[in-house]
Amino acid sequence: MKLCKCRLHNLENESEETAMERRKLTKEDIDKVRNIEGFPLGTDEDIIALSDAPFYTACPNPFIEDFIKEYGTPYDEATDDYHREPFAADVSEGKNDPIYNAHTYHTKVPHKAIMRYILHYTNPGDIVLDGFCGTGMTGVAANMCEHPDNEFRMTIDHEMPYVKWGRRYPVLNDLAPIATLISRNYNADFDVTEFEREAEKILEDTKRECGWMYKTNPTEESQNSFVETQGTILYTVWSDVYICPHCGNEIVFYDAAVDSETGKVADNFKCSACGATLKKRDCDNAFDTYFDEKNNDTRRIIKQRPVLIAYQFGGKRYKKAPDDNDLSILSKIENMSIPYWYPSNRMCEGKESRRNDKIGLTHVNHYFYKRTLATLAKMYDLICKSEHADMLKIWFTSQIINISKMNRYRPQVSFPYNPLSGTLYVSSMVSEANPFNAYEGKIKKFSLALRNNAGNCSCISTGSTTQLLVGDNVCDYIFTDPPFGANLNYSELSFLWESWIGVTTRSKFEAIVNQAVGKALPEYQELMTRCFAEYFRILKPNRWMTVEFHNSQNAVWNAIQEALQKSGFIVADVRTLDKQGSSFKQVTAATAVKQDLVISAYKPKESFIREMVEKAGNEDTAWSFVRQHLSNIPVVVIKNNRIEVSAERQAYLLFDRMVAYHIMQGIPVPLDSTDFYRGLDEKFLKRDNMYFLPDQVNEYDTARITTEVENIQFELFVTNEKSAISWLYQQLDEQFCGPQTYAELQPKFMQEVKAVDKYEQMPELATILEENFLQDEKGRWYIPDVTKEGDLVKLREKNLWKEFEGYMNSKGKLKLFRSEAIRVGFSRLWKEKNYKAIVDIAERLPEQTIQEDSNLLMYYDISLGRV
């Protein structure tokens, strides 16, 4: 690939700043990384053409180590004085920034939101990593820390006066070649003048050859004395043709169902031949047979007819039905050959990518009408011959989806581009847009978005995050927004773009849930565990990773937590994104999956890890963990003039974190809950049911003098025994209702128990009270204090173990059980190192039960590897 002039202009300045010189990627370079996981599908020539070494390669980047040696700093625990608490401030950044909207890539995080995290966790000159970089917003954020816009800088200086401005150096990676190509252009020098000039020239040259295909004769009512003799088509509406199930008549859907005056689409429509009232689902599609010249075979494709043309003439817009001349032009186009290359790949395997096989869209070229394909092919031919091809290719791909057959015609919507995001859905009415208008409009948008690009201080790689070409303990911070469950099948959705650029995703290493390619939740979790383990290896000790999470399924949330913990990270803070106000609120895991999440996790110091191994089995490991964990949790977070209660500082979550860390690292859990809770009160300072280190408590007490603590009442849905116990703790809390009799509790409890989880054997209220609470002389149930709680816990666990033994002695699938008994049983079997029994019982439980309970999943997952 030829170097862009805009980049050549900057080589002189670049060589003064860094020893890294631009070079051409060679086949010898590619051979060094050919066996790296996630190496994309494509020829060496196509990979070399896309690449801009050493800063960007369309394959695993063999120069990352050189980049880190140039910009990074070595880690030494003896001299390291870094300390940060998790970022706990509100974040509100909209999605209307020009750079956010320049390309139609599937998902993006606003770069100004990421800047806040980078500024909080890093110093100028630090290395920032994102292994699922998408369009490179983490890189944009890192680079813009040097040159923010004035308004944003003033806001940050007011909200975060402690931050240090200055460039951070991003290392970006993604499995998708289209993502890294976009990332490169968003994080490189961008000569706006050269881009605009070349893009306009390409459009003009293409229009000279293909513009006639978008001309139409005006109707009599729109004719006037203007010099123009023809109008320019803005879009053409194509309608599916159905077959009446009663008489076999062909029905053009638009003619039968759309009110041309109001634009409303009727649910029911009549067959013009027999008068039967029909719905779309009652009818089969009609099909046409045609010769696919590129694939050299005859194919069946869904029958569509042009039904409406919107055009511009004399400066005004009009609509008309296609006339004989329009149909003649379309026929001429269908019979002509396209003299330029265009992709004709078979759509990749997958549920989404093959969803349109049934209507005849089996190959990439089938997703475009013939004149659109001819126009795109001419444009791309010119782009590939340009010395500015890298910039022009992202401009080219930015409108491919909008001008494809996926652009739905929505008569009551004025916006011209309406594909259904996150899918390859083709509607029964398609709006074939004029590509010249589409691309003309994007020129200024790209110029506006990229005019302030911060230069070449980034390193971008294309491959799997399961195997990054980076050394140990070299990265200062990680911000990552990985794929979550079955939210989006990225490789399938990117296939149209990537087919044009000639390099496609190797989906074997794509961390998603996709049953069509044999990836269920366990396979997803395994890939995410490997990715997080690679992050853990690369991140410096005592440093932070921020993970964005978007999924409503509890099982996926548990899989992510499991993957994080298994890789060695410790979660210190979880917050939800309130979509209405774009603000963050702290939550517990029980409600976490209902909103988007921001997870703050840290890598412990090496000395701490050594101590845990050396003292394994000693209760000191529990307290070492707590001390380290408390030091990484915010001391005071004030929201709405109230001190926020930190769930991470409360006894139950400290215990859960301690147990999980020990189990994940293969270290014996040294304390049961009773001894742990007693030890917390003895060894740490307690304020408002939260625990603090001695050097933290003064800061909290000072804030407490002037600020009240928020009054939290978590919204609890009683669906199983565990949530029932939590609800009772809330009811009996002195700050809520306090001690109550059975008669007072029972009606309220019955109101709360609206729907019990499937398979859950819910105990009677009396049983739950007897096993978890104490009764005073007036018959009121109350929460036991620490001195009396131990005996109660032991009695309860004895009863639950007895119940669990009954499950062990039974046969077949467990269809109804107490989940609390399963938890107690797994915990005891773990202490006895009876991993086989854990696996045996787990495999008799419903899959949903294991996947949606983080504790059971943890015991089962680790035991499975030890059987």
Where are these regions (language model features)?
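Hydrophobic beta-strand segment of the Class I
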Residues: 478-479
